[in-house]
């Protein structure tokens, strides 16, 4: 039987590290009830329009959304929300919460991000309440976009920003793939291939967002933004966005 000779491999997580990992995995799990399964971020219209028809076209669509659209922008907002809570900058957090809600490209995307944000905060407060979280929620004083909510909760509980960013982007991409798989449709193996194929983009986007300023917010995914707008008038649909 092989025995590890690397002491780092065998080192146990500290109690704080284990708690942070446990909470992050819980909060960003598909089982965490924020209703993500009911939103497609416009992918449903892209399938109907013929832009997304199989695994390769879905991969290309999602890679663009991740690197140059919603994925990157949401990650930047998350990072700045996390830092505002850590630094106790109430004014910055309040301003960021307003910016995040104003920044979305369509009515349905606004519903998608604020409904999930509200659910995320409410459930986290009920199950993992603490004073810092209550203060941050009070600072927002209104609608909270999903990435801002994740940034607030993770910072309030001391979960490191870099890990939170990568976990968040993985969760977002996984939900997009799940929506695409139901619409095209795709099998489970193809879905996992897509998750594997998008791993480099998730890592790169998280790294970019970690050092980005709010001036870097912006996208180049006009077709995806149009899909989100067109979905509002789509006659037959499974998803809310």
Swiss-Prot record:
Kindly state which keywords UniProt assigns to this record, in alphabetical order.
Chaperone, Cytoplasm, Nickel insertion
Q: Spell out the subcellular localization from the entry.
A: Cytoplasm
InterPro entries recorded: UreF, UreF_sf
Q: Please tell me whether the keyword Cytoplasm is annotated for this protein.
A: yes
Extract one GO cellular component term from the record.
cytoplasm
UniProt keyword Cytoplasm present: yes
Q: Using the chain's own numbering, where are the disulfide bonds?
A: none
Task: Name the HAMAP family for this protein.
Answer: UreF
Q: What does this protein do?
A: Required for maturation of urease via the functional incorporation of the urease nickel metallocenter.
On subunit structure and binding partners, the annotation says: UreD, UreF and UreG form a complex that acts as a GTP-hydrolysis-dependent molecular chaperone, activating the urease apoprotein by helping to assemble the nickel containing metallocenter of UreC. The UreE protein probably delivers the nickel.
Under which name does UniProt file this protein? Urease accessory protein UreF
- Protein encoded by which gene: ureF
